[in-house]
From Swiss-Prot:
GO CC, any one term: extracellular region
Cell compartments where the protein resides: Secreted
Listed name of the protein: Beta-defensin
Keyword rRNA-binding applies: no
Superkingdom of the organism of origin: Eukaryota
Protein family: Belongs to the beta-defensin family.
Single GO biological process annotation from the record: defense response to bacterium
Predominant cellular place of this UniProt entry's protein: secreted
Length: 20
């Protein structure tokens, strides 16, 4: 898995990059 994964939060309605 890539370190930078794009997480889309449906219940918040936005996407953010997480360094996991």
């Amino acid at each position: 898995l890539p370190r930078h994964t794009l997480h889309c939060v449906a219940y918040h309605g936005y996407c953010f990059h997480s360094k996991v």
